């Protein structure tokens, strides 16, 4: 058995409940009150909170969950805390961040989707403004109101104007990346949708230093904020890393640790994770696993050169994850030296499943890279100037035992790791459901902070506090008839008991609803919609009700995520360079006219 998450056994819950009954830092108000919307009593010294958000990490990427990369510091937090095996998030980054920070469904926050994929028909509609709307309060707003200093260092992606930056959403100090990503070594954009890397400190444009590497610098900045703010106050520290989002980049000393690890290819890795998932009880023994997508390349059919290239891409990915963990360790050491570590609650999770997009199959991206100092070659892979990626096959392997990856509401896109540790949380494994909207109310309860006390709190939280589960007062905060639903850009999922319905758009989906029994079939291999039509209709009705309540908009006919990104990117480029493009087009047209006129005159002179 690998260290970290352990297979469940029948006595775990009883032992945890007994231990917690004598060791809780907070004295809860009772089971029934905890299950209702009450908070724990505050302790004499309120705990600090650290939220670590990894970008694009799969369920089994951390060592504690069975991953190949070395993540000893994350694993240490897992060993001393609660590890959630049935946690779901959004399939896209910005909606996850909005829900995580507010406890509110993404459509009610204003961040229903991301700017890169929104269709014109939705732009600016209620819930689709792509920034936190009035009346939506963050956990930073709430904690600052009860005396916390609130700090952030990392990716924001919840608006791109000064008014939409973290300082106007409860944060005292912030270094924030407004885009979906950026280069990890240099102060520059990572895709043509963005003209530059929009970094802001406390709402003002910020230039990165020459020796920048994202994971290191984000931790350095957070340490600086901790050391230069009022140490008499408890702190809320939000660390949303760029790792392991594209471009996948890592210092060579970390990448070198994985030489040869992935040489057997993506089929072998997907099968190995599937076997470990059964050993660890992440899925039942013998549960089926979905085949890799039909357009997946056969590893053995690749040339030796291509196999080496793609194995190296995954080595950099693992190196980037280990580098992030190393700097998390530096941050933890700083808290230990300051004497605050033992009174700090840590929450570690991922915003969605692994990224499948490639950097070698888009003419637009290749053209843009050539003008922005990027390459995708083996030489220097992961280092300055490299635009690293893992592609759809490795992403599907990383998402094992789930199906597909980021963007989709299959399990590979939305089932990710969750760890909560610190005062009031005993070591345990939690197999009951949890959703991204549950995190803010849970953290507020753990520190005894109110959830509905502010005058401008006009949008209610939709998530449920997991406090009763963490304290052993309940096995689950979701009953058999309670629904849990998600929707982003038409990709949708709804859970009820053991069942799940899901719908995914092209290119990997076909926009059809399907029904699965997740207890029997966590790989989503057998559609039950025809054999169990009553359950299907009941859950479709529940999703319709959810959509009406949350203000979900119907997608335009024929919506395709990749096509929409291309259109939106083209629009952005024309907005930035419209007059240059127009002038260039006129010059080309004039040259064509001149050439045609010259040809006409020449032909005329010959015939006269």
Per-segment meaning from a language model:
Residues 82, 157, 204-205, 210-215, ...:
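C-terminal accessory region downstream of the catalytic core in glycan-modifying enzymes
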Residues 162-170, 249, 333-421, 567-577:
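Histidine-centered active-site microenvironments of extracellular/periplasmic hydrolases
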Residues 63-69, 83-107, 112-114, 152-164, ...:
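Short, solvent-exposed turn/loop segments enriched in Gly/Ser/Thr/Pro and often Arg
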Residues 40-82, 91, 145, 156, ...:
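Active-site-proximal N-terminal segment of extracellular/periplasmic enzymes that hydrolyze or transfer
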Residues 58-148, 173, 179, 183-199:
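Active-site segment of extracytoplasmic enzymes that catalyze sulfate/phosphate-ester chemistry
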Residues 44-48, 100, 160-181, 215-294, ...:
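Active-site regions of oxyanion-processing enzymes, predominantly non-cytosolic
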Residues 172-173, 177-183, 383-413, 421-519, ...:
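C-terminal cap/loop subdomain of S1 sulfatases and analogous C-terminal strand-loop tails that border
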Residues 45-47, 54, 59, 83, ...:
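Long, internal low-complexity/basic segments
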